[in-house]
Amino acid sequence: MINWLSKNRQTVARGFGSVLALVLLAVLIQEQGDGELFSAFRRVSPGYFGLALVVLLVSRLFAILRWHILLRSAGVKISFLRSVELTFTGNFSSNFLPTTIGGDVVRLTGAMQLGYDRAICLASLVVDRLVGMAGMALALPFGLVPLFALSSGAAQSAAFSALLQKGMDFVRRTFESLSIWLKKPSALFGSLLATLGNQAFIYLMVYFLLLGIGHRLSFWLVAGMYTLSYFVTLIPISINGLGVQELSMTFLLTSLGGLTESESATVAVLVRIIFLITSLPGAYFLPSILAAMNSKEVDER
């Protein structure tokens, strides 16, 4: 038992972090009563929920396009359909893996087994994530400005110092990983445009959910709040951001958006549900990926 805990201490710690975040979320909801939460869920418009689902699916296609552009520009002969299959399979698998990059590991494994260049695929996944983070960073001021307006000077100073350190680390990792694509600025620009499209539709998904419970907030405020929540979930203290994402979104929607705790928790939970639903095509594509892997192994024999 002790040996198992020693080998899996990071997973155990993340599991504890998720449980703690979910408990804190439950406490917030309990303060207003369970009835308020169920009432907020009943108020969600099916039409707006459907729109939110559709726009998130569109955002997934932009995310796939971002990675596909990087792969093709590096000389990997991969079809867009294969990129779709690998990405959705990774998204689906990430629901059951302990970190937010679990889906990337699945994508890399699948690409390698299908015979694509390992080094380029690994580098493309790193750059894919970095470009995604760069796009998110562009929307960060829309969340930081209203958040700092609520915070004390000491909190602002601490937050700025932490963000500055993160930014310096981000720039260093970016230049280390961009060796191939720095010579292909058009590919980098295309992937950045794709990630901006991905973000716009994610923000639109949250915007529609808010409309679905009768709240019309500024689109840019929604973008800022979601971006702040995104960066919080990158902290490796939970399983795939579970609990931490919901808790941070609940706090931001309550503090900056003016929603009640129950309404904020409803939106946060629905965001998680919609991401889960839109990952389900990965379950459909998984058999075809496995079949392609088996076919590749047979050909090599």
Regions found by a protein language model. Name each.
Residues 1-88, 136, 145-234, 259, ...:
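Predominantly cytoplasmic-facing regulatory/coupling regions of multi-pass membrane proteins
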Residues 80-85, 99-104, 114-128, 259-270:
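Membrane-interface alpha-helices at helix entry/exit sites of multi-pass transporters
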Residues 90-91, 128-132, 271:
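Structural signature of transmembrane alpha-helices in multi-pass secondary transporters
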Residues 90-99, 227-242, 246:
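Transmembrane alpha-helix interface/packing and boundary motifs in multi-pass membrane proteins
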Residues 96, 106-110, 122-125, 135-137, ...:
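Hydrophobic alpha-helical membrane segments of integral membrane proteins
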Residues 103-112, 239-254:
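Re-entrant/interfacial helical elements at transmembrane boundaries that shape
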Residues 126-145:
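Hydrophobic alpha-helical transmembrane segments of ABC transporter permease domains
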